[in-house]
Each structure stands twice: as C-alpha cells, then as structure tokens.
Amino acid sequence: MKKWTRICAAGILAFVLSACGQTAVPKENPITGEKEEVVVKSELTAGEVMKKANAAAETQQSMHSDMEILQTLEMGDEKQEITSTIDMDMILEPLAMRQTMNMQVGGEEMAIEQYMTEEGFFMKDPQSGRWVKLPNDMYKEVTGQMAGVTESPVDFSMYKEYAKDFIFEETHDEYVLTLEGSGEKFSELMKEMLGKNMPLGTDEAMPVEADMKVEKINLQFSIDKKTFFTKDFDMDMIMTMDEQGQKIKVTQNVTGTMTKINEVDEIKIPKEIIDNAQKMDSRTNQQ
C-alpha cells in the first residue's frame, strides 16, 4: 500500500492544461447556472492561450504553492485514507526548496519539514523533532527527480490528442480549462503522466505499466489573463489498477494554488538548522 501511495503522490504536480480551437465562453456558476459577466470578451482561442501559457511557464523561476490532497486507497479488505497539506516555496535555478507537509494516515498525524539548497538537503525527523542533513548522493537524486517534475508543465506535447475534450471558459480576469473524462484514452494519459514523474531505476516506476483504468477524471485549471501564469488547479480522479492479480482502487482529490510567481528571491536555511543538524550518511540511512 505504501508503494501505491508514493505513485499517487508522484503525479500531483504533473497535471497541466491542453487546448482546443474555439474561443472562450463565459464561465457558468455551478450552483446557479448563471453565466459570469465578462466586461471584455477575449478573442483568443484555447490553442492561443495554451501557447501563451507555455511561453509564460518558461519564464517562471520561482513560486509559492499551497496544496491539499485527499486520497483513499483500497486493496482487498484493506483501506487507507490519507489527507495531506503542502506549503512550499521553490526556486528553479539554482534549484532550492522549502516545504512543510502535514499528513494524516490511519488516524496518525505526521509533519515533515524540508529545506533543500546548494548547502544540502535538510529534513526534520517527524518522530524525534531533530534536523538531519541527508547524504550528498540523496541530495543529487532528489534534485534530479524534482528537475523532471518542474520541467513537465512546459511539455504540452502529450496533451495534444486531448485538446477537443477540454471545455474553454473565461471570467473577467481568468481563462478556465476543464476536462471531464474516463476510459482507456485517459488511462493512457495517466500512465504517461506518472511515467514522466517517477524516478528512473526505482521499483516504484514499474507499476506504471500495470493494468490501469481511469473510471473518472475531472481537471480544471485557471490561467491569469494578464500574465498567462497558471493560478490554480483542481483534480478529482477515480482509477483502478491491477498488479499481480490484486485490484487497487484509488480515489483522489487534489487542489492547488500558485502565488508569488517570480517573487521568491531566496530560500535560506536557518543557521541553527545547519549548525545542529545530524549528518546522515548512506549507511545510517539504510538502518
């Protein structure tokens, strides 16, 4: 079950928008059914918005992100519910990150704090409360994995065949792209997303080839009309997977917001953490 939890988490930040050829229609209020008033209607097509969003993503060097993830994993009689919140600052060059993640698994709570800069990879042990400095080889491995994830939002090539499936709407200050789907077509999309974001050479990468079926997937992205940066996303998904004769059902909701884009200038590890962190070598990590 832990392996599948990691697989689900690996794809959280990999979902990006695609586009079709029509211009946007005013967004409909899901409760009242009324169309939102748009003062100046955009003449851009969804494809043009996608190209501009792609170009904007290439200029993105830093951001703050808040996410909430609700997951239920079922395998036979075993059921696991996981609730996670993530608060993160990230700079792409040189790659640096500050992250706080709170998880509730099976009634137990766990908080994980991390810093990663050129000074090293530091993590607060959720059990002891002490800071540890992880081995340099682990730092290199994690930065390599993160580099792949941070590059994925500007790779729109794998979404082209799903273009006609997106609903394209607009509000006064946002473009909204929504995808609702199910079946084999979207199962292949999920496999490609997970494959791009799983570390190569790990056991966790193998189940991506398992029999995966998307029963339901709803994605929604909001894009700022002025900057063309993606502001937030919402994903609901139900999928089943078979591995070695065992059926696993995953129900997942992920919501995320991206703010302070290109405004995070520095991520600095507090001096007391650097001075007092226990160094963990590869040997210690295996124990």
Which residue ranges define each predicted feature?
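C-terminal motif of bacterial Sec signal peptides marking the signal peptidase cleavage site
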Residues: 16-19
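Bacterial N-terminal signal peptides that target proteins for export
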Residues: 1-8
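Short hydrophobic/aromatic segments of transmembrane alpha-helices and their interfaces
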Residues: 8-9, 212
